[in-house]
């Protein structure tokens, strides 16, 4: 029986409240006073702003709101900041209200979009609000994690629905809202409904606070001994979190029995990367690591172990994600300051409470603990004073350590102020974009009046409003000049005085706004060119968001190599530094793509909100014939391998979906298959997540996660595996061409081909030739022969060298071990010979 079966025959507020309360009681749930108050306001039609601590049951209030909307025959929207949380809520609401009554919109997928209960991201709702405004069929909006309103890049999406949906009842929820008086007044003015602020500082699990001056290892040891674990240690960089995990390996965290349970739960889980191998050691010791740069499967494993109560300590960052279910008894702050991208500053009250509020597990703990470490130099000074004892002479002789230069200090007073402080008032992040104007112009009615309302009746101060008005005028003029908008002499049947000359829905995609530009740019490429497949990749890569960490690593590598070359050429220091400023990361087809974008944006102005950005990540990895591990190692990205994987997965999805089948050459199809298999073998959860979002009726989120941990054999995808083999062989050709025999020795030492063996073999080649080709022809299928011998569990492979004379007499022979390849998720091969082909 679903919650929808409990709907009363009429929408009387008392009947609604009684029906929902009875259902909750049947589930063994006793409503907290704040929940009761919020639900009473919801059923009477009031807007509600709910600010209660983490773990106080805001989700139950949201369910009650949806229940009320359904009883009143209204469409109700639930929004969350991330797609994973939207997906999770979708399945939760399906269980409550039945799959036929719940839909989902994420930008990537649309499921049952006509359902009366819709789960979506804030951006999706904002897009609907801009396009349809007061005409949208939306009777209620439940906005979870409303503090995202103040996010610099995304906050606009939390404001637009409030401005544009006066017909809706709003329920705004967060644990860290601060002063919301202006929102109360604003919502009442716009919607004509009373607005109730429901606030409670009472936590289901009370918190106690402590400021300590002991070394952090001593602090952690004491927390473990006093049964205050699991402890979440807050760091302000991912590197610090990993370093802390390593430093804690000297503390005995778990009993033998607990370690056995950890090993049992880990089972056959594959730690496929360099960081994964370190993580395996940490978690088996009872130490977790959790941050956004990790592979999703590693984060999920840490969460699984934590939920089973097997981890004593989790080393993470201050950005413990929304919707991440990591049970914590104690939160330990290593500092009360952070670098925010511009400067080091004291934590804001909202930041502090957002993470401190994670302490204490409802249903498990009777108390939660929040501990803050003093600065290291203060701790060392306290230690020295303690050693001196009570002797005044000894204490005077203690040389106090000074804070590092530029250090932003904190103290117990800082800690006390943060504890007492309410979260800061939410700051408006309104912004004007091309798509905003286009969406409003596409609506029925007077677009000028609608835009004036948006620009002058938002939450911005007047000075900012004037800036937005100037930008809107500039965008409108560009739309007129580009012929995208035309004025009408008389209003049309729907009251428009201006109209679009293009079909916005066909040309604009919320999740891939530059996909139509990519489609137009494919026509600029020559299908007969040897670089066609890679050029197609470069077009698609230019439309993807920039992964800053990867691009910075590529730039650092390019500059490092350039410095070495300039030193060898005797270039003076000042000139070297001047030249270095011009060196950046690789940008294939930059001139072509920037010109094409300039032309395209004149007739498709909405793309101007998303500048094209040439880059080479997929192309770079493919041209270097690198595996995932080799790529992250080469660019020193092991600590942010999750970001690398997310980019690769996004690129695979874009390549697969954006490029029409008739434009996919054999080489390009091979490359796409290779990329998809590479992502799946490293961590299939991102691709599985997309598939599950598109087909939620096939499996639940939990089933999709379980599937992600059960990796398919890499040899099962024969086409992709051939490319992996080809890349593995060609990687050796490239290294041989660069005379990197030491790297070759590291690759093949186990099969008898150490650096000396490779050097000796290649000496013969260099005696005959002065170059070894590594261009498109050199890696083509004509120079690679594969003899499949599944009966013996292997493939025999021969890679021919592209010598400058075209003799094709030299090459590499190897055997590919199929079973080992499946075990490791990559092409595992053993070099058998390097030399003239007659000798192989």
Tell me what each language-model feature is.
Residues 212-236, 243, 300-308:
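Conserved interdomain hinge at the start of the Helicase C-terminal
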Residues 288, 307-308, 393-394, 398-798:
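Non-catalytic terminal extensions of ATP-dependent helicases
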Residues 330-333, 337-339, 345-386:
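Conserved segment of the helicase C-terminal RecA-like domain
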Residues 802-840:
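Compact beta-sheet-dominated globular domain cores
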Residues 1-40, 44-48, 256-284:
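Helicase-associated low-complexity/disordered flanking segments
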Residues 21-23, 29-205, 212, 230-235, ...:
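Conserved P-loop/Walker A NTP-binding site and adjacent catalytic elements of P-loop NTPases
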Residues 79, 87, 94-103, 238-313, ...:
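Conserved C-terminal RecA-like helicase domain
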Residues 114-129, 285-296, 306-325:
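Conserved two-lobed SF2 helicase motor
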């Amino acid at each position: 029986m679903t919650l929808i079966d409990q709907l009363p025959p009429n929408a009387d507020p008392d009947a609604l409240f009684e029906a929902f309360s009875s259902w909750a009681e049947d589930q063994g749930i006793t409503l907290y006073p704040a929940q009761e108050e919020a639900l009473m306001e919801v059923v009477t039609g009031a807007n509600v702003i709910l600010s209660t601590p983490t773990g106080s049951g805001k989700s139950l209030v949201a369910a009650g709101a949806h229940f009320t909307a359904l009883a009143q025959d209204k469409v109700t929207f639930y929004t969350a900041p991330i797609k994973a949380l939207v997906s999770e809520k979708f399945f939760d609401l399906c269980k409550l209200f039945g799959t036929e009554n719940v839909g989902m919109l994420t930008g990537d997928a649309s499921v049952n979009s006509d359902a009366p209960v819709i789960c979506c991201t804030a951006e999706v709702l904002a897009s609907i609000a801009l396009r349809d405004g007061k005409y949208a069929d939306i009777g209620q909006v439940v906005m979870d994690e409303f503090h995202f309103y103040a996010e610099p890049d995304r906050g606009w999406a939390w404001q637009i629905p409030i401005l544009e949906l006066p017909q809706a009842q709003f329920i705004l929820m967060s644990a860290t809202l601060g002063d919301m008086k202006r929102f109360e007044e604003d919502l009442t003015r716009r919607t004509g409904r009373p607005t109730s602020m429901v606030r409670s500082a009472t936590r289901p699990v009370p918190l106690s606070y402590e400021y300590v001056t002991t070394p952090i290892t001593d602090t952690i040891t004491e927390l473990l001994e006093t049964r205050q674990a699991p402890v979440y240690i807050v760091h302000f960089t991912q590197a610090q979190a990993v370093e802390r995990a390593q430093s804690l390996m000297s503390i005995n965290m778990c009993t033998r029995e607990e370690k056995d349970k950890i090993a049992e739960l880990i089972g056959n889980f594959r730690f496929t990367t360099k960081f994964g191998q370190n993580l395996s050691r940490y978690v088996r010791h009872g130490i977790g690591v959790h941050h956004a740069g990790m592979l999703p499967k590693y984060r999920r494993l840490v969460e699984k172990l934590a939920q089973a109560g097997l981890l004593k300590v989790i080393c993470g960052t201050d950005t413990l994600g929304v919707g991440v279910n990591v049970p914590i008894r104690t939160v330990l702050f290593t500092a009360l300051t952070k670098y925010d991208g511009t400067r080091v500053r004291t934590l804001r009250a909202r930041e502090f409470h957002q993470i401190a509020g994670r302490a204490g597990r409802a249903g498990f703990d009777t108390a939660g603990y929040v501990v803050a470490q003093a600065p290291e130099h203060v701790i060392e000074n306290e230690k020295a004073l303690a050693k001196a004892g009570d002797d005044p002479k000894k204490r005077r002789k203690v040389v106090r350590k000074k804070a590092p230069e530029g250090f932003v200090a904190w103290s117990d007073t800082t800690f006390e102020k943060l504890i007492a402080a309410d979260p800061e008032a939410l700051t408006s992040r309104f912004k004007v974009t091309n798509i905003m104007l286009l969406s409003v112009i596409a609506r029925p009615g007077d677009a000028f009046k609608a835009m004036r309302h948006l620009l002058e009746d938002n939450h911005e101060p007047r000075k900012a409003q004037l800036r937005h008005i100037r930008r809107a005028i500039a965008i409108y003029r560009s739309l007129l000049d580009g012929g995208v908008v035309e004025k009408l002499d008389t209003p049309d049947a729907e009251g428009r005085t201006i109209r679009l000359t293009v079909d916005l829905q066909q040309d604009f995609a919320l999740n891939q706004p530059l996909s139509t530009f990519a489609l137009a740019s494919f026509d600029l490429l020559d299908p007969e060119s040897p670089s066609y497949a890679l050029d197609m990749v470069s077009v698609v890569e230019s439309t993807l968001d920039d992964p800053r960490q990867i691009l910075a690593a590529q730039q650092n590598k390019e500059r490092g190599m350039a410095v070495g070359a300039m030193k060898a050429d005797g270039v003076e220091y000042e000139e070297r530094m001047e030249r270095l400023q011009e060196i950046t990361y690789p940008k294939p087809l930059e001139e072509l793509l920037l010109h094409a974008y300039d032309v395209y944006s004149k007739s498709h102005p909405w793309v101007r909100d998303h500048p094209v950005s040439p880059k080479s990540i997929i192309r770079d990895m493919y041209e270097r014939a690198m595996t995932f591990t080799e790529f992250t190692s080469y660019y020193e990205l092991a600590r942010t391998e999750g970001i690398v994987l997310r980019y690769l997965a996004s690129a695979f999805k874009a390549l697969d979906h954006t490029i029409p089948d008739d434009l996919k050459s054999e080489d390009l199809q091979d490359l796409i298959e290779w990329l998809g298999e590479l992502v799946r073998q490293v961590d299939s959860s991102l691709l599985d997540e997309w598939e599950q979002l598109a087909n939620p009726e096939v499996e639940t989120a939990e089933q999709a996660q379980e599937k992600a941990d059960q990796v398919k054999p890499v040899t099962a995808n024969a086409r992709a595996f051939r490319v992996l083999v080809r890349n593995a062989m060609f990687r050796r050709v490239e290294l041989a061409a660069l005379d990197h025999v030491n790297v070759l020795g590291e690759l093949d030492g186990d099969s008898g081909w150490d650096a000396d063996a490779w050097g000796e073999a290649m000496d013969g080649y260099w005696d005959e030739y002065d170059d070894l080709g590594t261009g498109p022809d050199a890696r083509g299928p004509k120079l690679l022969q594969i003899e499949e011998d599944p009966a013996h569990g292997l493939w025999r492979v021969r890679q021919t060298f592209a010598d400058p004379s075209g003799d094709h007499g030299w090459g590499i022979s190897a055997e590919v071990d199929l079973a080992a390849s499946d075990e490791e998720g990559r092409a595992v091969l053993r070099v058998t010979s390097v030399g003239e082909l007659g000798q192989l």
